[in-house]
């Protein structure tokens, strides 16, 4: 399971990009969609549905950060969101899996938000940033939480201005102020 959480998800954007670039419906139908659906199947089984306030949410615990186990890291939430978003879109295009779309949309509608914190390390600009997990992990050695922007393309130029500004703050804090992996 750990390898599925860590490694296999990185292939989802590659399959999507190939289809989006070529428009090859045979590739989508026989290669990309089956692979993306397998990743979705994994997430459906692996994620936990829990009560949250007066509703519920789906959570994910992964070990993608050098052997730490994190609840709802933005990097993993981005891959989940990308996977189910593509499954909904591609299943409509291919005319398949209509009965599964309700579940996929439910997951998309009930994913946690990315945790936003005020940075704790200096120097910093005193601006909110995305944390590495729901607990507010603030290790500034890399900006893994921006997988939402790349490779997942969930956070993009069409995202709301607040989310984009927090992404800019995050990149500056983790990669410029704290010098990323350069120290």
Stretches with model-predicted labels:
Residues 75-115, 119:
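Polar, glycine-rich mid-to-C-terminal structural blocks
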Residues 17-22, 27, 32-33, 38-49, ...:
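Non-catalytic carbohydrate-binding regions of carbohydrate-active enzymes
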Residues 7-16, 75-86, 141-153, 181-183:
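Well-ordered alpha-helical segments within folded domains of soluble proteins
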Residues 70-77, 94-97, 137-142, 176:
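Hydrophobic alpha-helical scaffolding
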Residues 38-93:
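Acidic/histidine-rich catalytic neighborhood
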Residues 2-6:
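Short, small-residue-biased leader/transition segments that mark boundaries at the very start
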Residues 59-65, 82-87, 125-130, 145-147, ...:
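Short acidic (Asp/Glu) and glycine-rich catalytic loops that position anionic groups and cofactors
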Residues 62-66, 115, 153-155:
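Short, flexible loop/turn elements at secondary-structure junctions
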